[in-house]
């Protein structure tokens, strides 16, 4: 029989740098999970990713206090900021002038990387989703 899932935990940790300090420690500790076991497993799975890139993770907590986790791709905003060479997006998007520019080729590259996590059937729909994220950040797609 399958294990009974008691909770789901959503976290965002830097690749290869999960530590038992907040936010990881308290989130896992309140469910009685072994924090160091998660940190070691997460760091091992993200060792080949770009260091310090934010990696969303969905942790399934089982009744016997064991867990499994699923890694997602980094957020679109992370890829867009990297492509535009910015530290952050606009404070008032669509009112202030664009803070940066990304090309459609860059948008397509980001869409291909994010395709597994996006709710899109084809690359064109994924490109529109990423372009919308860029617009919300105050970036101009050229």
Swiss-Prot record:
One or more lysine residues are methylated. Keywords: Methylation, Ribonucleoprotein, Ribosomal protein, RNA-binding, rRNA-binding. SMART domains: RL11. GO terms for cellular component: cytosolic large ribosomal subunit. It holds the Pfam family Ribosomal_L11. GO terms for molecular function: large ribosomal subunit rRNA binding; structural constituent of ribosome. GO terms for biological process: translation. SUPFAM superfamilies: Ribosomal L11/L12e N-terminal domain, Ribosomal protein L11, C-terminal domain. Belongs to the universal ribosomal protein uL11 family. Forms part of the ribosomal stalk which helps the ribosome interact with GTP-bound translation factors. Part of the ribosomal stalk of the 50S ribosomal subunit. Interacts with L10 and the large rRNA to form the base of the stalk. L10 forms an elongated spine to which L12 dimers bind in a sequential fashion forming a multimeric L10(L12)X complex. PANTHER family: 60S RIBOSOMAL PROTEIN L12, LARGE RIBOSOMAL SUBUNIT PROTEIN UL11M. This is Large ribosomal subunit protein uL11. It comes from Magnetococcus marinus (strain ATCC BAA-1437 / JCM 17883 / MC-1). The gene is rplK.
